Every structure is written in C-alpha cells, then in structure tokens.
Amino acid sequence: MDERIVKFLKKMHLASVCAIDDEGQPYAFSAFYAFDELNFCLLLASCDESSHVKFLKNSKLVAGTVALDTKIVGKIEGVQFQGVMREASANEREIYFKRFFYAKAMDPKIWSISLEKVKFTSNTLGFGKK
C-alpha cells in the first residue's frame, strides 16, 4: 500500500462514512477511528441501536472520506474509500482501545471497515494530485 496513505490514516482520527438505509438511500455518519495498518482497516465504535449499524442488514458496503481540516488549498489532503463493514475481531478491539483507551470504560461494540478501494489526494504535491 502507498506509504503516504498509511501515514495519513495513522495521523488522522475522524472519518465520514456512508451506509445504505432501508429505502436504498445514502446515510452519512461520522466516527472516530483507529487505523489497523496490518489489515488495512478502519476501526470504529458504535452501538447496535445506531441507525448506520442497523442499516448493515441492507448492505455491508460503505464508502467514506478522511480529510484534513484546513482552509489552505495548498494543504488539502484526504482519502476516499470504499469498503465492507463488519464486527471487529478481539485483536481489532485492542487496537481501537490502544488509541482510545478512555472508551474501554464504556465497553462499546467495535466495528471494522476493510478498505477495498482507496484514493489519496494531496494538494501538497500540486493542486489536485492523486
């Protein structure tokens, strides 16, 4: 995998993700994530009662973005992704809690998004460079 993508995903912590709702429409949500570099997954916490988790019965396919929050055009960087969301393994849970140790007290369910397609854009390389 492109080392720039790995470095960027390790540095960031907030993803915008889109699932498919009961009417087949896109449903967006934001989540803090930990990056599992070995398995190339984003790990996030969410409860079974959340709308986006309920929508996984329709399709486990998701898409989303991770972007640097900046107003300076020359510093814009981001990842666009497509993947599959499923319940995280015990090892993945540990990776999440290593990054967000304070969340362990709430004992949330952890989910894994395997990154199947990824595109990285960085204006630091020149405007609109992929």
Q: Residue locations for each model-derived region?
A:
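Active-site-adjacent structural patch at catalytic or cofactor/ligand-binding sites
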Residues: S46-D48, N58-D69, E77-R86
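Short, surface-exposed beta-strand-loop junctions and turns on beta-sheet-rich folds
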Residues: D48-H52, T70-K71, F127-G128
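Charged, gly/pro-rich active-site loop segments
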Residues: V73-K130
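Short beta-strand segments
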Residues: M12-D48, A63-V66
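Extreme N-terminal tail/first-helix region
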Residues: M1-S16
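Short, flexible, solvent-exposed loop/turn segments with mixed acidic/basic and small polar residues
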Residues: A31-A34, K71-K75
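Short acidic (Asp/Glu) patches
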Residues: S46-S50, A63-L68, N91-Y102
